[in-house]
Curated annotation (Swiss-Prot):
Putative inward-rectifying potassium channel. It holds the Pfam family Ion_trans. One of its GO terms (molecular function) is voltage-gated potassium channel activity. It comes from Oryza sativa subsp. japonica. Belongs to the potassium channel family. Plant (TC 1.A.1.4) subfamily. The chain crosses the membrane at residues 33-53, 97-117, 132-152, 206-226. A nucleoside 3',5'-cyclic phosphate binds at residues 225-344. It is a multi-pass membrane protein. Keywords: Ion channel, Ion transport, Membrane, Potassium, Potassium channel, Potassium transport, Transmembrane, Transmembrane helix, Transport, Voltage-gated channel. SUPFAM superfamilies: cAMP-binding domain-like, Voltage-gated potassium channels. It is found in: Membrane. InterPro entries: cNMP-bd_dom, cNMP-bd_dom_sf, Ion_trans_dom, KAT/AKT. This is Putative potassium channel KAT5.
Length: 368
């Protein structure tokens, strides 16, 4: 209920009532900072979960002292024996794969990137680039851990990709094996293929085939996103080039003087350079948030959100013409209705000046 009340706060324009200490408000700064801290833990889980599965020496081993209260029994049921071997086996059997279920938490990171991309305080370009970089690094790390997992779970170590090149690699450090796995993973992802490391058994060959298929999809995704970002960033440049070309062709076709051509080019360049600044100035001149709707109603522009109600209300939708026909006979009610749209004394003068500026711009563009 707290989340719904906070979501409706911006629509009604008033803050929700104070909540109790036992209610978690998702819009408080403390909750947001805690959520950001959880994102850091999610990133650590994304790195540690595959790494602990592939390298047993990297996982921390806790000391647990157990004193059995009963006697040692001989289990003869097949289901009990199977369950015991799954839980207490050398590599914990299938239970080790359940550690990868923590990767489901990555959806929180995906939601974070989706929220940051919509935030105007952050650059959309750098946000997308960081997201693509994180996806690439996670793919490299996950593939390297799978390669290591296949090596340590294969019976004949000499018939693995690292055992055929480096003898007694099990005695080497954890980071040495991980570095070799990342090296092979990144050479496979980059389609370099030096040939020093290669698959030597059927399992490694099958995984290499699946990894290359995933590599083609990931490469297409990255290239498509980067192309979209480059086109988005260079769209204004291409518009300016088209404008310069159009002005040059227009001047040559109509045999305009060189001075007039330079003035037209300078005017166009000034418009593109000050486009962002003029947009900010236009927003400042509009003033309060409700004035936008008032201007739209005065110019008979349909508004998508015209009514907001806090209680059960019956709303009748009529056109601008029918409203004038209903208000004109009742002068007192008409003054009250239209006074809601005109909040300042200079508003009518501002609309008249806006109309004059619109006519001047239309005349200049029609003359050109």
């Amino acid at each position: 209920m707290a989340a719904r009340s906070e979501l409706l706060r911006s629509a009604f324009g008033k803050a929700s009532p104070s909540l109790g200490w036992f209610i978690v408000n998702p819009h408080r700064y403390s909750y947001r900072w805690w959520h950001m801290f959880l994102i850091m833990l999610v990133l650590y889980s994304a790195w540690a979960s595959p790494f602990e599965l592939s390298m047993e020496k990297a996982a921390s081993i806790a000391l647990v002292v157990i004193r059995p209260s009963g006697r040692c029994l001989l289990r003869h049921r097949h289901c009990h024996i199977l369950l015991r071997h799954l839980v207490t086996g050398k590599r914990q059997g299938l239970w080790g794969l359940l550690n990868l279920l923590r990767l489901w938490r990555l959806r929180c990171a995906s939601k974070l990137f989706a929220r940051v991309e919509k935030d105007v305080r952050f650059s959309y370009l750098w946000t997308r680039l960081i997201k693509l970089l994180c996806v690439t690094l996670f793919a490299l790390h996950f593939a390297a851990c799978i390669y290591l997992w296949m090596v340590f779970n294969y019976k004949i170590k000499e018939l693995t990709w690292i055992g055929s090149q480096i003898h007694s690699f099990e005695d080497r450090s954890v980071w040495f094996c991980y570095t070799c796995a990342v090296y092979w993973s990144i050479t496979t992802l980059a389609t370099v293929g030096y040939g020093d490391l290669h698959a030597t058994n059927i399992g490694e060959m099958l995984f290499s085939i699946a990894f290359m298929l995933f590599n083609m999809g990931l490469t297409s995704y990255i290239i498509g996103n980067i192309t979209n970002l480059v086109v988005r960033e260079t769209s204004n440049t291409f518009k300016m080039r088209d404008m310069v070309q159009w002005v040059s062709e227009f001047g040559s076709m109509n045999r305009l003087p060189e001075v007039m051509r330079e003035q037209m080019l300078a005017n166009g360049q000034l418009r593109f350079r000050t486009k962002e600044q003029l947009q900010h100035e236009h927003v400042k001149r509009i003033g309060p948030r409700g004035m936008v709707g008032e201007i739209g109603v005065m110019f008979s522009i349909p508004q998508p959100f015209t009514i907001r109600s806090r209680r059960l209300t019956q709303v009748v939708r009529i056109s601008h013409i029918h409203l004038l026909q209903a208000v004109r006979p009742n002068t007192a009610d008409g003054c009250i209705v239209f006074s809601n749209f005109i909040l300042v004394s200079d508003f009518v003068e501002y609309l008249e000046s806006l109309k004059v500026q619109t006519k001047e711009v239309a005349f200049v563009s029609g003359h050109l």
